[in-house]
Amino acid sequence: MASRSQNRRPAQEVDNTISYVQCDGLAAMKMVKHCHEESLSNMEVAQGALLGLVVDDRLEITNCFPFPKSSDETIDEEEYQLNMMRRLRLVNVDHFHVGWYQSADVGNFLSLPLLESQYHYQTSIEESVVVIYDTQKSKRGFLTLKAYRLTPQAIAMYKEGEFTPEALRNLKVGYENLFLEVPIVIKNSALCNIMMSELAEMVPEEEGTHFLDLGTASVLENHLRSMMDRVDELNQEANKFNKYQQTVIRQEQDKHRMLAKHAQENAARIAKGETAIPDDEITKLFRPPTVPPRLNPLIVSGQINTYAKHISQFCSQSLAKLYMTQALQGAKENKQ
């Protein structure tokens, strides 16, 4: 997972000091190339460092480089990053660390390692962002690059280090306000724009038949399977929390019963003129059970919400294609 090797400032509540992110076309192409190459291998996610600089309220990403594969234990990740930035500095390339990037599947990037990594980045470099590239959606023709930062509530949650229901309730933290999306724009030089205009004229025009492709069952099936897995995981977390609540209730009942019995015994002792026994021993017998952390259920809920949104959007697009196909088929039959 992404790591920071530079000196870290003390954790503090970080406001969003960046209005938007400006990414050079070369850096975007390098991220896309790396993520697609890793998606074809056995690597679950592709990760890398973002280099650039901050100008006023704009974060400029001018270059990037991939992190070494985690399966290679012979490479020191922090030393690798330092050597890369040192060599880039020698060739007059922006070498300031401004964040990191990661690939995602169908936009569902929310995970515990990502939260921890972005927390360390953002408390070390206040303006840092994480750029998420959706490989599956981009394969279908939609370039998806999004930049995110942790919200002040999420920073405060990690700073306190408590993920109990009461702590999350007091901080008003939910899966919908863990991250704040920062607008991202891709900038090319004037020569690149001229070349792209010339290439656009050289590319043959598509007939448009691929837009009516109805082979969408596999995509929808993968979405549903992933969401079912997340629902099962959330159900297991709910069962753990229910068992914890039942344990607390049962312990309180036993404690109340023993205290009542002890009060009767003390009343009898006082009636006999003896000294009452304190309740400290009984209180020590009933230690409160460990509260299960609620961060993982919070993340799983966010993943379910993401899958549900994608399924809803995908189904609406598929229905539109079906209606278009029905209209075209009817027009064809009328001509015949």
From Swiss-Prot:
GO terms for biological process: formation of cytoplasmic translation initiation complex. InterPro entries: eIF3h, eIF3h_C, JAMM/MPN+_dom, JAMM_MPN+_peptidase_M67A, MPN. Its main location: cytoplasm. It is found in: Cytoplasm. GO terms for cellular component: eukaryotic 43S preinitiation complex; eukaryotic 48S preinitiation complex; eukaryotic translation initiation factor 3 complex. The keyword Oxidoreductase does not apply. GO terms for molecular function: metallopeptidase activity; translation initiation factor activity. Residues 21-154 form the MPN domain. Pfam families: eIF3h_C, JAB. The keyword Cytoplasm applies. SMART domains: JAB_MPN (SM00232). Coiled coil: none annotated. Keywords: Cytoplasm, Initiation factor, Protein biosynthesis. Belongs to the eIF-3 subunit H family. PANTHER family: EUKARYOTIC TRANSLATION INITIATION FACTOR 3 -RELATED. Component of the eukaryotic translation initiation factor 3 (eIF-3) complex, which is involved in protein synthesis of a specialized repertoire of mRNAs and, together with other initiation factors, stimulates binding of mRNA and methionyl-tRNAi to the 40S ribosome. The eIF-3 complex specifically targets and initiates translation of a subset of mRNAs involved in cell proliferation. Component of the eukaryotic translation initiation factor 3 (eIF-3) complex. This is Eukaryotic translation initiation factor 3 subunit H.
